[in-house]
């Protein structure tokens, strides 16, 4: 892992994240990954090594235990992942409610700052698909620094723009 991270740094990367992550997997498959040494602990180890190498670290965490592990590993930013992003044409269907997200994000935040009071905590994923959703959670959480966008920043806006543009072309009268 150290060699791989050094190569990334040498070609200009300044930070890393544990994605894809086993944190999105549950059930027997997750148990099998953990039992065979390919679980979340490997992701924690990668974050620890990356931090030692002075790379910026922004790991996804899914619960208090994982948050504490990543905080102990020295993560710069803890991204509380509340599930695959919903909305859009390929968004996940199964998701927490916004109020459930508030609870999870706050619990993880409270736990990780006990390990490292300086850590930055962001929320991400699940029903947090638009600015209003992120605002809802952020206004109800204490000490959470912001929102970490992925699909909500790159996939969803493109889908909206493509649909609108296609609609306008379809309106052309011949």
Regions found by a protein language model. Name each.
Residues 1-174:
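Alpha/beta enzyme core
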């Amino acid at each position: 892992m150290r060699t791989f991270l050094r190569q990334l740094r040498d070609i200009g990367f300044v930070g890393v994240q544990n994605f894809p992550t086993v944190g999105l997997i549950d059930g027997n498959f997750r148990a099998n990954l953990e039992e065979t040494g390919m679980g979340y602990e490997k992701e924690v180890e990668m974050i620890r090594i990356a931090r030692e190498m002075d790379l910026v670290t922004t790991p996804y965490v899914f619960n208090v235990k994982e948050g504490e592990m990543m905080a102990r590993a020295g993560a710069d930013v803890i991204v509380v992942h509340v599930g695959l992003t919903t909305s859009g044409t390929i968004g996940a269907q199964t998701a927490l409610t916004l109020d459930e997200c508030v609870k999870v994000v706050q619990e993880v935040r409270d736990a990780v700052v006990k390990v490292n009071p300086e850590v930055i905590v962001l929320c991400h994923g699940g029903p947090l698909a638009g600015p209003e959703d992120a605002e809802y959670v952020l206004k109800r959480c204490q000490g959470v620094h912001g929102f970490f966008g992925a699909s909500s920043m790159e996939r969803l806006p493109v889908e909206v723009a493509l649909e609108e543009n296609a609609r306008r072309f379809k309106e052309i009268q011949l």
